Amino acid sequence: LETRLYECTECEKTFSNQSVLSLHQRTHTGEKIFKCTECEKSFMKRSQLIVHKKCHIEERPYMCTFCEKGYNQHSKLIEHIRTHTGEKPFTCTECKKSFTKRCNLTEHLRIHTGAKPHKCNLCDKTFHYPSNLVEHQRTHTGDRPFQCTECDKSFIKMSKLMVHLRIHTGEKPYKCSECDKSFSQQSTLVVHQRTHTGERPFQCSHCEKSFSYHYAFVVHERTHTGEKPYKCSMCDKAYSQRSNLKLHQKTHESKPQQDSPNCEKTFEQESAPKTATMDQLHESAGLEKVPELPEATNSVESPEAIDDYEKNYIPWSPLSEYLGVFLPPEKQHKCTECDKCFLEKSKLVVHQRTHTGERPFKCSVCDKTFIRMVHLLEHRKIHDGDRPYTCAECGKSFIRMSKLTVHRRTHTGERPYICAECGKQFSQQSNLVVHQRIH
């Protein structure tokens, strides 16, 4: 008799019985049904749980001779010793990269094979690593578990929080070797270095013009495609640049809204004498008009021309890249401590408090102080007893949505904080920090 084979619908692997297939499918779904009663960790296999439970037993017979850490498994001790010796015995045959653990090599190999076994059940997107899937799923749930203690801003990834914290600390670890300018992000340094190298990596497939900045490239491509993604909510006009939309919206502020049969005219057509011209609007808004990109031989800007364009119309700050608004340097509100730029002076004043330590908003009940009024108002809820965020599962209520989000994990079992060393997962960031000390 032929042996019946059970096939996985995700990766087409076959198995001799249904139970083994079910066990295998958990590698795709991430399901971990075997939970430790001592801590929050859970496992795909019962055997993994049994091994894990030993870590809660005091007996750790396998001791490290370098640092005296103890382990309940010899294999764990061997893995740990490699952190002292630097040994990486598991080598990728494709790129020769080495790893201390076999499981890390297995995950790395997916980069070469293209295997993405971890699938989102909401949008069918697939990922190489389970941690990437967990991060992606937060785009659906809105969960932002990594919260800044200075300003309460929250993030999907720990790496994003770490970059954000540099705004408060002023740390700029990425230094340009050409001009000694420093940056808080490596990607920002890479883009800055193009001002020295003249590199223009963004090339238009329609006319072969090339650009140093991705934003300039995107805006240019719209001259070919006709795309106008920035739409006015007042009259349905659309523009290829956000700055043009902002300028157009000022025409609604300066005159009553009227229904017009010519609503679909472009902004360039609006510049007739009956309305303000583009130059007048730029002047009234304190903005500098964005010129046409200069023509040059081979349809690529000369180094001098692009240098002039980028220096005068794309000042080096997150401002132009993020908002698409081009401000001349004299119009910017710039922090003297970290070079961050702001559209409004009031925003700069608030930001500078992260450097000076000034906290002008004081609670009249407990004398606690805050950088921003909104933080004081949120704090006052503690004294007022206002807890507007209520758990639908158990009725417990909280002052902040972020606190409710953490609490909900006690019901859902979600553990978004993942240890990069061993894959252990936690429901709270503080628990991950404590755990990481064992590594």
UniProtKB/Swiss-Prot annotation:
Q: What UniProt keywords are attached to this protein's entry?
A: DNA-binding, Metal-binding, Nucleus, Repeat, Transcription, Transcription regulation, Zinc, Zinc-finger
Give a GO molecular function annotation for the protein. Answer: zinc ion binding
Q: What does the UniProt entry say about where the protein is found? A: Nucleus
Any coiled-coil ranges, and where? none
Q: Name one Pfam family in it.
A: zf-C2H2_6
Predominant location: nucleus
- Note down the stretches annotated as region Disordered: 246-275, 285-304
Function, as annotated: May be involved in transcriptional regulation.
Q: What is this protein called?
A: Oocyte zinc finger protein XlCOF28
Q: Which organism is it from?
A: Xenopus laevis (African clawed frog)
